[in-house]
Amino acid sequence: MATVTLTSCAGVDDNKIEDNPNIIFILADDLGYADISCLGQNKFSTPNIDKLASQGMVFTQHYSGSSVSAPSRSWLITGQHTGHTVIRGNKGLPVEGQHPMPSDTYTIFKMLKDNGYKTSVFGKWGLGAPQTEGAPENQSV
């Protein structure tokens, strides 16, 4: 499963943001260092990701905050150590399988919006089922 986070300063208050970059962050479960062609994969090509990489920044020293997905996502969007995030494990709950992240949790989405960005997420969320406080629309996404 992959999550793509898009942020844009298009259409925001020009007095608040000037020339801030657009951000595209791609998170893919089980994607290894050399699984895309711009980082050495030669058995198949990933031309669209390669083009994005050639026109922007590529970070190669990233690591997972946990061995399972929900705590890793929580760690990523809150900036908290996994011992401090509310979501500490993948739970076997119905629907999304997670306790919802509280709506008052300060996240990268809230920080970006506070600085004039528009944000969105596509793909797996895993931080709260629909109609809970952890749902993306209740997390400033």
What is each residue range found by the language model?
Residues 1-3, 7-141:
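Formylglycine-dependent sulfatase
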